[in-house]
Amino acid sequence: MKALLDLFKQVTQKEEFDSIKIGLASPEKIRSWSYGEVKKPETINYRTFKPERDGLFCAKIFGPVKDYECLCGKYKRLKHRGVICEKCGVEVTLSRIRRERMGHIELASPVAHIWFLKSLPSRLGLVLDITLRDIERVLYFEAYIVTDPGMTPLTRGQLLTEDDYLNKTEEFGDDFSAAMGAEGIRALLNSMDILSEIESLRLEIQTTGSETKIKKAAKRLKVLEAFNKSGMKPEWMILTVLPVLPPELRPLVPLDGGRFATSDLNDLYRRVINRNNRLKRLLELRAPEIIIRNEKRMLQESVDSLLDNGRRGKAMTGANKRPLKSLADMIKGKGGRFRQNLLGKRVDYSGRSVIVVGPQLKLHQCGLPKKMALELFKPFIFNKLEVMGVASTIKAAKREVENENPIVWDILEEVIREHPVMLNRAPTLHRLGIQAFEPVLIEGKAIQLHPLVCAAFNADFDGDQMAVHVPLSLEAQMECRTLMLSTNNVLSPANGDPIIVPSQDIVLGLYYMTREKVGAQGEGMVFSDVSEITRAYESKALELNARITVRIKEKKKSCGHGEDPIETITRFETTVGRALISEILPAGLPFALVNKTLKKKEISKLINASFRLCGLRETVIFADKLMYSGFSYATRGGISICLDDLVTPSQKTGIIQAAEQEIHEIANQYISGLVTQGERYNKVVDIWARAGDQVAKAMMDQLSVEPVKDQETGEIRTDKNGQAVTQESFNSIYMMADSGARGSAAQIRQLSGMRGLMAKPDGSIIETPITANFREGLNILQYFISTHGARKGLADTALKTANSGYLTRRLVDVTQDLVIIENDCGTDGGVVMKALVEGGNVVESLRGRILGRVAATDVINPETGEVICSEGTLLDEDTADEIEACSVDEVKVRTPLTCETRYGLCAKCYGRDLGRGTPVNVGEAVGVIAAQSIGEPGTQLTMRTFHIGGAASRAVVANQAESKSNGVVRYSHHIRYVKNAQNELIIISRSGEILIQDENGRERERHKIPYGATLHVQDGETIKAGQILGSWEPHKRPIITEYAGKIRFENVEEGVTVVRQIDEITGMATLVVIDPKRRNIAQSKGLRPLVKFLDENDQEINIPGTDQPVSITFHVGSIITVRDGQQVGIGEVLARIPQETSKTRDITGGLPRVAELFEARVPKDAGFLAEATGTVAFGKDTKGKQRLVITDLDGIAHEYLIPKDKHVTAHDGQVVNKGEVIVDGPIDPHDILRLQGVEALAKYISDEVQDVYRLQGVSINDKHIEVIVRQMLRRVQITNAGDSAFILGEQVERAEVLAENEKLITENKMPATYEYVLLGITKASLSTDSFISAASFQETTRVLTEASIMGKKDDLRGLKENVIVGRLIPAGTGLSFHNIRKKQRLSESTVYLDADLTENEIAE
């Protein structure tokens, strides 16, 4: 009986594996997979529809077409299982094996595998050290290659043309052998001695001095080492046997009408077989060489197309002129195997429908249409029906359900109770795009969604659709309930703020409810408690907005367990609406939080306070109650838009006339030649922008206040001076914008102010504005101008979405394997956090930056010296507030950047899980969360910041810095200055800053002070707000002397290096240095105009401490302001360089800027940083470049070649610090890493990315950016291999080097040294250790080619790899599953030896 039952068991192979290895298949291996050789190109017999024997679908090779039935029908049924029919040779078994069994084709002539040939860098070329061009000539029969030179002067691997070959054969006879085609290449590979090649290459790397040689040798060495280590042979890159895919994977499907649809692969295989058979026949017939060669070339081409069509030459096309889909095309790209079937699967038990709003739902509920629920929960219903005895079989149960028996609905209710379902809205940009809800059955066909979760899903009800998924197993239901239920996702993982925040109608209702109206009915009444107010309000004795006095019970959180909360009763002056809201406040929230007009921001703060003070459960209930109140009072308020709400200000015509008058004057100035065309345009745009702002201000002033009317008489109230009493306006449009429900001041301005200036699609501004608004209506010209700019917006949106999605994909890919895997890595590293100050404003407080981090050292109160919190403490709200209050300046906190966990992160370095508000759990996939948090707001970023010709960026060039607050001045350590004759302090440092500290020594502001500025304050001086700290000339850059003495010019020759220019207006003559390219006299090209200083005895003044004379070079374009022989004092200006301000560089902003930072691209026209601390000098110029030399303290010179048109900010004899900017321009992040270290790099990337997001009002925690930077830095470059197996200059995972070094140190050998390399996110994803993950990301062919040559092993550490092989991911609940599995395996581990394991593998 048992044996019988075994028959019905599925043939399942449960293989436990820890890693997947990829490599080259040897011909023997291919034959061992195969069940027979495919000899004919035939597929199936067109009459009988049976597969042809020995053909591509042969049943003898691949297995039976029908289950347990041979082809001729002699053996049918299960009892003959395993019999091989003697008539047709088919094994009687399941037809499913046609998906698994492979065949093979014996090739008549070897063929090169196109991937190893053409995928750059060509692996064949690397192994043989022959160029790809030459190999192709051999393979495609254009040249001979010498395989064995014998005693002749030829060399191995030399190419011979047809003529050469004939000549050499005449000359040497049979002393040498040469061959053509893949045979020649194979012979070379076969005869190669890998070990001796490796030896000679290692020697070459040590001895040679040439960089390129070392690079090339290292590349070859890497490939050969891999072959040596993996035990694969290079000649396997040439195919002699071709595997044939199982037929079910390349099916032939009959269509109606006797035609067939076939997979392209069959076509490609048929071509290979046809050519191969023809070649065999030609060889048997001893055909002429030229015919055979042609046939061999065609065979090579057909195998190329089969493996990767279109990689070389023209792609093979089918009958319909469409390129055929080859094996490589099957796996790569969006529609390939990886991304289509392995990473994105369609799932069962799911449905989708349109969503509608469900305002009556609780936060954890969703409305599910009965029809849908019935279909989704069918199996559960069948089971219940059977258990209850309503149906005896599944079939009967099915019938009951189809007939919609009334009992089915009762069962459905029961089945659905407490069985959560998951709702998902595409695109799922972050983890809140899928949440679990408890279904509530509803009539109709649309899913009902709770309004408060719309923000997380980014859903609206204009026709959006959502998908429903049913978690089946108990574990899945449990995870849904504990991790995914919407009530457990109140906070946004991106920044830790609540994401369940009321919006639109709800905000409007709550705002209306909490506004105060002067003279409303019932004003000034006094009530004993809120229920009394409710009665009065219901009976219409009170208005909602009336000001009243009432006693309100405030409940503090209870101290003990089971005690009632402590109540305090306080008397408040408040309004009716606010008192009503106090009823729904949870215990522990003070009434003061709602005793104000509730706008959107305030409501957000309210929910945040509730979460922190009262916990999750109370907050969710509170949010629901807020929603119900908001909707209810928005309905009662009846706020709507009417035309009279759009008030056009009376001053508008006057403002416009004044602007037109100004423009008329400027036009006249332009005509008389006083201003240029560009200046005129800029001024016009400025005037209109200002006029628009004035109109908008007048409009908002008029909108936002209204006179108070008496309730009975309807007359306007006046105060004792006869002035009208005013109050904040109850204008509907104003209320909508003010509350934050919908619209903004900018939109109201277009409705009832003036539309203002419009932009063209290229971002430039049209100088004639639209003076009308929408209330007045536009004329045809105005309408045309406005459509012009609006279209651009639509086009941009479409581009933006695609780009943003691609950025997210790259970010996820680079961080997908970063998971919290231990609690504490024990590092003492960290970064120092300060408040972020820009200009005079605190952009982000210290509290905000350290909240949710772990302190890396004890935080000490600077005044008392006591410890506020000890090392290793998670800084929560209270601690952070305390630190802020104690005026601590900086806190060292742990960071993902310095975490020492090898493959992952530790919980301490990460800190708080922002989405839960608790310390992060082991198993949290923080990498993916970081990627989503940065990618998700990407769609809100702009594609580019327009250099708005004055309109938006009308910030005038600053010419002074003034303090915003009182405090004490502190100079930054970079500042260097000299005192001039007038006793003014002149700055001579490049990156000087002035800090202003408050009385506790806490940094309040930070101002950059440029070179040449005059300082107006001393270090340590106490100043008032508004005091000027420093001033400078904005449009000219001075060259300032640090020495006094008599000037001597050198190489300053009029007409040679300088020209005399006479100013047209002032008539003064000045000397201007001319560009060497434009100098007409040949010998003047190398001359640099410079100035030296002489003392009283006419001796040259030297740089202090050296015998080098002081010399200051004048740059191109400098206007020299001193005369030869003039006496100058310290701090005087020698020359001025005019700065071009009009040429606004189009700064990449928005999304492209974020992508540029994460891709670590070298910016165009990058600035130069000083490589060392030392003295600057200029060397001899080369053509078009100037040479700058920095001599460091040890006397070592560092040279730079800098393009002539670049502005060097340093001058001769100046001392610069390592990492300081010496040539203006955007900074290259690679330089920051090299010169300033990891921390400075992280700070740079963090600040730059945050700038872009902050501009759009998106807040993202720094942690997420640090996580990404950590992944960009995960590879290191070997600077010295020591005794390790690494190669000099090789890039490896840092974890790998650390492990190897530990091993070497225990063996008392020399460890390898390395330096960090910064990789962009795309490169970092592709260079990951996991080839499965890299192949599914981009450049699949290249990744797989490289991995198979290297014989790579994928340890399946990341999330993607595990999804692809179909396992639970090693994150969250899956992490413990994997850990337990591994432990069990280790306890049972016995070593099994497989017959075809190579000796190397056994030895390992």
UniProtKB/Swiss-Prot annotation:
Bilayer-spanning residue ranges: none
One GO CC term, this protein: DNA-directed RNA polymerase complex
Origin: domain of life: Bacteria
Record-listed Zn(2+) 1 binding positions: C70, C72, C85, C88
Residue positions binding Zn(2+) 2: C825, C899, C906, C909
Gene3D superfamilies, per database record: 1.10.132.30, 1.10.150.390, 1.10.1790.20, 1.10.40.90, 2.40.40.20, 2.40.50.100, RNA polymerase II, clamp domain (4.10.860.120), RNA polymerase Rpb1, domain 3 (1.10.274.100)
Keywords: DNA-directed RNA polymerase, Magnesium, Metal-binding, Nucleotidyltransferase, Transcription, Transferase, Zinc
Reactions that this protein is recorded to catalyse: RNA(n) + a ribonucleoside 5'-triphosphate = RNA(n+1) + diphosphate
Oligomeric and partner information: The RNAP catalytic core consists of 2 alpha, 1 beta, 1 beta' and 1 omega subunit. When a sigma factor is associated with the core the holoenzyme is formed, which can initiate transcription.
Similarity remark: Belongs to the RNA polymerase beta' chain family.
UniProt protein name: DNA-directed RNA polymerase subunit beta'
Organism: Nitrosomonas eutropha (strain DSM 101675 / C91 / Nm57)
Gene that this sequence comes from: rpoC
